[in-house]
């Protein structure tokens, strides 16, 4: 019988750790949430940084009418990452989560879900129901955000229905009114006939629809002596026949040429017809109208036709020909006839044209979208239906030249998804013209990410209408306006605003509906116009964008936070939403932008790039993801993305992220397992570290610098890739693999082993802090498994300082030298792999490698032979001059190592004694 081999495993320093290989995040994270995050961590972080420089990221409030979705998750994870990083850098960084609660969506859902008839219950009861509804979803969303690891003052969020928030908002309105920026006017606004309210620009979305464009003949009644008016028509073109009852004029281009085209005799009534059309469009229109026999009998310059009167086809009034301009109706020759149907009640440009030329205004559609008596025989018809009936009437009565099917982009309500209309109604407006130049200047003071955001916002402000701030709803902040009972004059004073603020601060805005006007106006209030002392209240509420757009005052100033905020971060749709409404109110009230920086993100789409929607059934719930993969996987997904663009999300993508997570986790686990007996209070001095350790610290130093820059510039995708590269390439595939022999086989308390442990500890300590803003749950788990110095013996890495680079570790000479060594390793690795495939060796320790080189290359290899052997993890290495392989820069030969395999370290040696190589024998004897 052969002699039984001894078991030397008990003499090795094998890894020991309770840190599991598998994260089991869905189970572990809720435990961490309860034990750490919900145990006063946020307050402890603020206390640690008290008195330090502030950093305020102001939270754009999500609408509290449903559970959190993937877009919410992306947004809040980005915010949480920034705030965590800033706090670890020592900033006093409070985060006050917000909730948007007022307005139409909540009203609609409350009515649908609870079966309410709004007209049959008191306003205050209806408002209380809306409040209960939105409070429920606010609580649901709060739990959702906390599950994602988002830290903040969840016990004291700001909610747009809070009394103090509402009172401050009323103050913002009062300040703008005092400065003359608020006025009441009859102007066209976006109007949803289903919701029966005006809409903001940010509340509309465009969809492609198929409709009918019509070419309509307006008979000339007064030609100003330019031509014979008999049987002569000006032809207009419109895609909205329902607006024809509002037609008050026909706009043409002053500098265009117009032709009077005579058609051949009409067979039915044997009369000649003459049509006036822009010369450039005659051929196109005639072809569309299927008219082949025609001739031009007269031409005019557009300016000559100004003042010509045409009879409205079906109403008893005239339509005057007027001249367009760049600031009113801008007539083009791309489509139509060069003569634009102008209805001042139904469009911004038409309205401005009407003002310029005193055309007057007729609003022939009511709140519900039905034509009124002003529409003549079409009264009572829903506007969309009247498109067909008006077109049919025009055809039957000889006024329709042609109807053509077209596909065009049309505005829809973002809530009910139904088409909307432009319609003039009496509304309250904020006059953007009053402070537009100041807003444009303020935009230039802001740092925009991406930088094209500055141009985008500037162009929007340059072209935007006055802001319609009134809404015909009840769930919201009331417009704090009284009207004189006798003469109807609006009554708004500093005293009335203050009185309403005082009432709202204690009783909330329900008081506006619960109390009589006499109990809300200041004592001694009199109408400035007629002296009457009796008033009635405005019934409209403020646009919800005024709610959230005022939070720089109602939250930042009200709570004593920094104003302007350091950062606003929202989706790229908020250029026309919250970014803009906040900018307008802030400049109007204080003359400054409400933010120093603006960062925007894209939308979340599915794996195929499609928008997530209920109809497609492709929505992804962040809570479902957290319960299946873990919130840290969702956090890594968000931070790995190019969030400035739309971000794809699917199970396959999350599985890929999980693979990266496992590599990061296993790097941490390896280090934890090999530092179980290391005391961080007793590090090995830098000069006593081995050269490969010093190289590892150069890589760590680079990681710290790169990730610091990445976090500072919000380049989270770069940070994710830097960490992944460091863990996989620098650590797992190189450094940690190479030092395994030293860790396992050297004497436990030897300088060599302690040097490796010191280096690994520095690496893990920095790595866990870099990871804390990213994968906060896992970082807490790693932190609790680590040994710590007394100085950093804190319960959470969030209470530690973010790592800083160490100048001593910046060893350029070592970095350059090891870059060459790594190149050698990569060349030899291919030959080792080939030998393994050919069964020459089992693993690299079975190998003896010979490298052939010459000149400086040979000299470098010879000088660093021991280091190269260490890096290759082989039992034997020879460096020989010349005889290299022709096809490669280095010649490499791999053969099986000679001697016998040491039973302890597994290296081959020619001088084994009792199964041990001389090195292992020496270690055991010590």
Predicted regions and their residues:
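Residue patterns forming the tRNA-binding/recognition surfaces of aminoacyl-tRNA synthetases
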Residues: 2-18, 22-25, 31, 35-39, ...
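N-terminal catalytic cores of NTP/NDP-binding nucleotidyl/phosphoryl-transfer enzymes
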Residues: 47-109, 160, 236-238, 242-244, ...
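Secondary-structure capping and boundary motifs in well-ordered enzyme cores
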Residues: 49, 53-59, 71-74, 78, ...
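Acidic, turn-prone loop/beta-hairpin segments
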Residues: 100, 189, 193, 200-207, ...
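Cys/His-coordinated zinc-binding microdomains
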Residues: 196, 472, 488, 531-532, ...
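Short functional micro-motifs and their immediate structural scaffolds
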Residues: 200, 421, 492, 534-536, ...
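Protease-associated
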Residues: 245, 249, 256-342, 348
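Alpha-helical recognition segments enriched in aromatics with Gly/Pro capping
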Residues: 357-369, 473-475, 494-646
């Amino acid at each position: 019988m052969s002699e039984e081999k001894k078991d030397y495993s008990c003499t090795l320093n094998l890894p020991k750790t309770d840190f599991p290989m598998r994260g089991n995040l869905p189970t572990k994270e809720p435990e961490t949430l309860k034990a750490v995050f919900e145990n006063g961590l946020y307050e402890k972080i603020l206390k640690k940084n008290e008195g330090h420089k502030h950093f305020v990221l102001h939270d754009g409030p999500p609408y509290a009418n449903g559970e959190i979705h993937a877009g919410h998750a992306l947004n809040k994870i980005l915010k949480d990452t920034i705030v965590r990083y800033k706090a670890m850098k020592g900033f006093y960084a409070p985060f006050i989560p917000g909730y948007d609660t007022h307005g139409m969506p909540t009203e609609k859902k409350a009515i649908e879900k609870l079966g309410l008839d709004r007209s049959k219950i008191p306003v205050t009861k209806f408002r209380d129901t809306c409040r209960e509804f939105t409070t429920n979803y606010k609580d649901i969303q709060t739990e959702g955000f906390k599950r994602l690891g988002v830290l903040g003052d969840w016990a004291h969020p700001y909610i747009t229905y809070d009394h103090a928030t509402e009172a401050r908002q009323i103050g913002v309105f009062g300040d703008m009114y005092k400065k003359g920026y608020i006025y009441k006017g009859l102007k066209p606004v976006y109007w949803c006939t289903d919701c029966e309210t005006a809409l903001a620009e940010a509340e509309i979305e465009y969809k492609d629809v198929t409709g009918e464009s019509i070419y309509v003949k307006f008979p000339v009644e007064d030609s100003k002596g330019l031509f014979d008016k008999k049987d002569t028509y000006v032809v207009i073109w419109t895609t909205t026949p329902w607006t024809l009852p509002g037609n008050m004029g026909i706009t043409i281009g002053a500098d265009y040429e117009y032709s009077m085209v005579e058609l051949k005799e009409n067979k039915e009534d044997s009369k000649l017809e003459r049509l006036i059309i822009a010369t450039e469009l005659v051929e196109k229109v005639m072809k569309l109208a299927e008219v082949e026999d025609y001739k031009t009998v007269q031409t005019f310059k557009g300016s000559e036709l100004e003042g010509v009167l045409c009879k409205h086809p079906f109403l008893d009034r005239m339509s005057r020909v007027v001249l367009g301009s760049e600031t009113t109706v801008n007539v083009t020759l791309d489509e139509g006839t060069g003569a634009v149907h102008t209805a001042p009640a139904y469009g911004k440009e038409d309205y401005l044209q009407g003002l310029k030329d005193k055309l007057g205004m007729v609003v022939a559609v009511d709140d519900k979208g039905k034509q009124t008596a002003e529409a003549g025989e079409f009264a009572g018809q829903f506007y969309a239906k009247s498109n067909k009936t008006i077109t049919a009437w025009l055809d039957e009565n000889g006024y329709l030249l042609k109807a053509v099917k077209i596909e065009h982009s049309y505005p829809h309500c973002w809530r009910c998804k139904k088409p909307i209309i432009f319609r003039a109604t009496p509304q309250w407006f904020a006059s953007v013209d009053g402070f537009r130049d100041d807003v444009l200047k303020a935009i230039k003071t802001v740092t925009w990410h991406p930088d094209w955001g500055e141009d985008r916002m500037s162009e929007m402000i340059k072209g935007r209408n006055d802001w319609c701030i009134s809404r015909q709803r009840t769930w919201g902040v009331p417009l704090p306006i009284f009207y004189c009972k006798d003469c109807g004059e609006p009554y708004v004073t500093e005293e009335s605003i203050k009185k309403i603020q005082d009432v709202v601060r204690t009783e909330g805005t329900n008081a506006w509906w619960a109390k009589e006007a006499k109990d809300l106006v200041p004592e001694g209030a009199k109408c400035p116009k007629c002296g009457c002392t009796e008033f009635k209240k405005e019934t409209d509420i403020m646009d919800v964008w005024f709610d959230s757009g005022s939070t720089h005052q109602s939250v930042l100033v009200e709570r004593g936070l920094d104003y302007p905020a350091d950062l606003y971060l929202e989706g790229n749709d908020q250029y026309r939403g919250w970014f803009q409404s906040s900018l307008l109110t802030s400049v109007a009230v204080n003359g400054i932008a409400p933010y120093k920086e603006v960062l925007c993100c894209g939308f979340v789409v599915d794996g195929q790039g499609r928008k997530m929607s209920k109809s497609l059934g492709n929505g992804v719930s962040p809570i479902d993801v957290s319960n299946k993969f873990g919130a840290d996987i969702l956090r890594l997904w968000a931070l790995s993305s190019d969030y400035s663009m739309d971000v794809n999300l699917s199970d396959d993508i999350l599985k890929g992220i999980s693979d990266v997570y496992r590599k990061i986790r296993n790097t941490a686990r390896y280090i934890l397992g090999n530092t179980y007996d290391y005391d961080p209070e007793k590090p090995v001095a830098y000069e006593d570290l081995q050269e490969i350790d010093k190289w590892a610290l150069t890589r760590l130093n680079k990681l710290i610098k790169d990730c610091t820059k990445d976090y500072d510039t919000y380049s989270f995708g770069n940070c994710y890739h830097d960490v992944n590269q460091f863990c996989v390439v620098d650590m797992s595939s190189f450094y940690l693999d190479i030092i395994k022999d030293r860790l396992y086989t050297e004497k436990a308390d030897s300088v060599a082993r302690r040097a490796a442990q010191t280096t690994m500890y520095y690496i893990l300590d920095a790595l866990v802090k870099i990871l804390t803003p990213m994968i906060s749950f896992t970082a807490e788990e790693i932190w609790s498994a680590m040994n710590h110095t007394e100085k950093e013996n804190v319960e959470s890495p969030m209470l530690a300082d973010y790592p800083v680079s160490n100048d001593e570790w910046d060893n350029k000479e070592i970095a350059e030298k090891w870059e060459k060594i790594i190149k050698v390793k990569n060349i030899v690795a291919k030959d080792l792999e080939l030998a393994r495939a050919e069964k020459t060796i089992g693993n690299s320790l079975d190998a003896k490698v010979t490298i052939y080189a010459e000149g400086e290359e040979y000299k470098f290899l010879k000088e660093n032979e021991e280091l190269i052997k260490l890096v290759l993890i082989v039992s034997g290495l020879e460096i020989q001059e010349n005889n290299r392989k022709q096809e490669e820069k280095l010649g490499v030969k791999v053969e099986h190592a000679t001697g016998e395999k040491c039973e302890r370290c597994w290296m081959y040696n020619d001088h084994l004694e009792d199964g041990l190589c001389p090195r292992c024998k020496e270690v055991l004897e010590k």
